Regions:
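Non-catalytic cap/lid and distal C-terminal segments of serine-dependent acyl enzymes
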Residues: 3-22, 27-28, 34-53, 57-61, ...
Length: 259
């Protein structure tokens, strides 16, 4: 499951003196945190482990050390990580695991932790004060009876005041990822909101798809919005070995280029 809430705040169920529920949210040690100098601090609770390491997206493996301050924890500070989105795979005794106290994304056909390191010269993917569009979920059934779920982004005011231009862009994710990655890891909604807010683009609907989406499903989705099958569609595909950081940059250039 992909989630982006503060995972370090986990509820602790307790009762007060009268026996009434009095749950609280104690802070636990962050599994992944980014420091002011953009280093990555990693922590994992694994008291019985013989070895713990993390493998970064560039393939570098960093060994963690037993914490002298926190019993059962392994820790390390990693300097000079790549800016942007970074997959971080925790390894315990040589086996990949998911750290429940760190953000979780999806890649390599499995759940995987990640770190988001601020970029100095790129902020289109960040949440900003601007008009925000909407994300819709559409369920479709193909000829084989398989039900699929696809995500659609429409900009603020879509369908009003001539904002609807009838233009569509289909995003196709990498083979080892899923269409929801466009929202959580690609930050497509934020990028589109910010580009629209600055007048760089206007009235483009985005369909976020897996690599197996069919033309029939695309047609069914666009028909809901009154868009004809003959309407021109732009296609943008994430490379199988492309980082999400690179994909975000390329997507911004792509969208500005088709205006």
């Amino acid at each position: 499951m992909v989630f982006f809430d503060p995972v370090y705040r986990q509820i602790q169920f307790e009762n007060d003196e009268d026996g009434k529920p009095a749950g609280k949210y104690p802070d636990v040690i962050h599994g992944i945190s980014v420091t002011e100098d953009n280093s990555i601090e990693v922590n994992l609770f694994a008291p019985d482990a013989k070895s713990v390491s993390v493998v970064l997206e560039n393939g570098t493996e960093e060994l963690l050390y037993r914490s002298k301050k926190n019993d059962g924890y392994w820790e390390k500070t990693i300097g000079n990580p790549a800016e942007g989105f970074n997959y971080v795979t925790f390894m315990v005794n040589g086996t990949p695991v998911v750290n429940p106290a760190a953000p979780v994304g999806f890649g390599y056909n499995r759940a995987v932790n990640f770190a988001e390191v601020p970029e100095r010269n790129f902020s289109w993917h960040e949440l900003k004060k601007t008009d925000h569009g909407q994300i819709h979920i559409h369920y479709s059934c193909d000829g084989d009876g398989q039900v699929s779920m696809n995500y659609v982004y429409t900009p603020a005011g879509y369908g009003e005041d001539n904002c609807d231009t009838g233009r569509v862009c289909v995003l196709e994710c990498a083979a080892d990822e899923r269409n929801f990655c466009w929202i959580h890891q690609g930050k497509i909604a934020n990028i589109m909101d910010n580009l629209s807010g600055e007048g760089r683009i206007k009235g483009i609907m985005i369909i976020m798809a897996d690599s197996t989406i069919s033309d029939d499903i695309i047609g069914n989705i666009t028909a809901i919005y009154g868009i004809k099958d003959s309407a021109q569609k732009e296609w943008f595909k994430k490379g199988d070995n492309e980082s999400w950081t690179s994909c975000r940059h390329r997507f911004v250039n792509f969208m500005c280029g088709i205006q």
